[in-house]
Regions:
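Short, intrinsically disordered, mixed-charge
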Residues: 108, 123-124
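Ferredoxin-like alpha/beta domains used as RNA- or RNAP-binding modules
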Residues: 1-109, 135-211
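Glycine- and Gly-Pro-enriched alpha-helical subdomains that act as flexible
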Residues: 125-129, 133-135
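Internal active-site segments that recognize and position negatively charged phosphoryl groups
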Residues: 108, 112-117
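Short, well-ordered loop/turn sites that connect or cap secondary structure elements
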Residues: 115, 121-122, 141
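Residue-level marker of beta-strand positions
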Residues: 120, 126, 144-146
């Protein structure tokens, strides 16, 4: 994921909801949202929540999605522009494209505990697509492609822990996951209705960039 100078858990608190950036910690009582569900800062606990509207609401939605997928502004704008040129609703195109990123698919497959960890696995050359090394986190997967971890990583403690936790999570309809062999096959393109966490109102982002 793109580097953020701000502490990861503060990003979730800023958005007021879990973005699942911290991996396994997000599923425990140690999660910052569970412990301190108020905006970060010296007066965060006593500060009244502002009711956002218009531009403020659009901006917050954009920031939430950027942080969820770990993107910088230039990268995110590029995805928006590509989504505008593609057939179909721009907002849906955007979310589907982000879901197809290889680092996200590694996470969705339960091979990593977070998108950030998935990105590191990709960058370090541990991920294979159809048996060939791909070290580009932004690589967009397509139906029939198989994503796997190289055998050396099958006994990695972080990978094993991520796999065990993923077994209790909901399935991903567009992925056929083989946890025993540390791989997954893309059986279809992701659909917008399959992406539920965090809640995203992508039309607000489309409106923001259309100005």
């Amino acid at each position: 994921l793109a580097r953020h100078r701000e502490a990861i858990c503060r990003l979730c608190r800023r958005e007021g909801q879990k973005l699942f950036l911290k991996g396994l910690r997000c599923f425990t009582e140690k999660c910052a949202i569970e412990k301190r569900n108020f905006v970060p800062g010296q007066h965060g606990q006593s500060r009244r929540a502002k009711k956002l509207a218009g531009y403020g609401l659009q901006l917050r939605e954009k920031q939430k999605v950027k942080r969820t997928y770990g993107l910088l502004e230039r990268q995110f704008r590029n995805y928006v522009e590509k989504s505008e040129r593609a057939q179909g609703p721009t907002g849906e195109n955007l979310i589907v494209m982000l879901e197809r990123r290889l680092d996200n698919v590694v996470w969705r497959s339960g091979l990593a505990s977070s998108r950030s960890q998935g990105r590191q696995l990709v960058l370090h050359g541990h991920v294979r697509v159809n048996g060939k090394k791909v070290n580009i986190p932004s690589y967009l997967v397509s139906p029939s492609e198989e994503i796997s971890l190289k055998e050396k990583m099958h006994q990695n403690a972080m990978v094993l822990e991520a796999r065990n936790v993923a077994q209790s999570q909901s399935t991903v309809p567009w992925l056929e996951i083989d946890r025993d062999n540390f791989k997954a096959r893309v059986v279809a393109l992701p659909k917008r209705e399959n992406v539920q966490t965090p809640p995203i109102t992508e039309q607000l982002i489309v409106e923001l960039y259309s100005k």
